[in-house]
């Protein structure tokens, strides 16, 4: 992967080899048609709809976890999302006993229970403070930073990963099931499809989702789509790495 060129924002999305980066999936997540989000300024929880039709009977589940995955807060809210709307659902209360680094998980379900939107945040009890006195024409420096050093203390986890691949015309689609059987968070898990065991990564590739964080016991299914010709005679092999993945 090459260093970011200017403008840096574009190169946070994908690199010269069309390898999608974490920023790509963050942007993709934010453009969900129904999207729950957290307001950093006032700790509010919002629901955004980009649909042109009303969505009724939604359920939003909000949970806060300490670094050790102790659940510190949970709340369920029923909501309707009018077409092309933004609505504040509620404001998080002050939660006692939070670890310096903690996590916020948002899950939005439709009336059938299907997950239609989600979001996951790692947050700090120490707020970032901007140094407004040193603002210039292109930036404002940070005086003090949020504290995420505790992320380095996350226990190592071993994931269960399985895959199957199907051919559709000139494309191959690899279906990946990834599960976190541990009692710890699997943080920022990156999946890649390689040309055989320890082979080169297949690029370009379109992942349904990636750079995933899995709560204890959580299982996810995602797909990767790429040109079948990229495989040659090799068998596709999925590899999972991550912040604290063995």
Describe every region a protein language model picked out.
Residues 244-246:
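Basic/polar N-terminal segments that are highly enriched at the extreme N-terminus
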């Amino acid at each position: 992967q090459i260093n970011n060129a200017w403008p840096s924002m574009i190169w946070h999305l994908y690199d010269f080899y069309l390898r999608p980066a974490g920023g790509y999936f963050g942007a993709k997540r934010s453009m969900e048609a129904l999207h729950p989000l957290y307001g950093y300024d006032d700790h509010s929880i919002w629901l955004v709809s980009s649909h042109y039709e009303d969505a009724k009977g939604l359920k939003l589940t909000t949970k806060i976890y300490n670094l050790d995955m102790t659940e510190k807060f949970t709340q369920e809210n029923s909501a309707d999302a009018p077409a092309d709307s933004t609505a504040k659902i509620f404001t998080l209360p002050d939660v006692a006993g939070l670890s310096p680094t903690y996590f916020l998980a948002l899950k939005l379900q439709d009336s059938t229970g299907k997950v239609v939107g989600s979001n996951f945040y790692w947050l700090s009890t120490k707020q970032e403070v901007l140094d407004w006195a040193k603002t210039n024409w292109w930036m404002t420096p940070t005086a003090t930073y949020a504290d995420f050093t505790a992320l380095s203390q996350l226990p190592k986890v071993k994931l269960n990963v399985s895959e199957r691949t199907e051919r559709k015309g000139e494309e191959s689609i690899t279906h990946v099931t990834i599960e976190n059987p541990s009692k710890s968070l699997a943080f920022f898990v990156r999946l890649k499809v390689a040309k055989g065991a320890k082979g080169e990564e297949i690029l370009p590739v379109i992942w349904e989702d990636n750079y995933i964080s899995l709560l204890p016991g959580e299982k996810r299914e995602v797909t990767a789509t790429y040109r079948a010709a990229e495989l040659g005679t090799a068998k596709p092999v999925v590899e999972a790495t991550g912040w604290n993945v063995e």
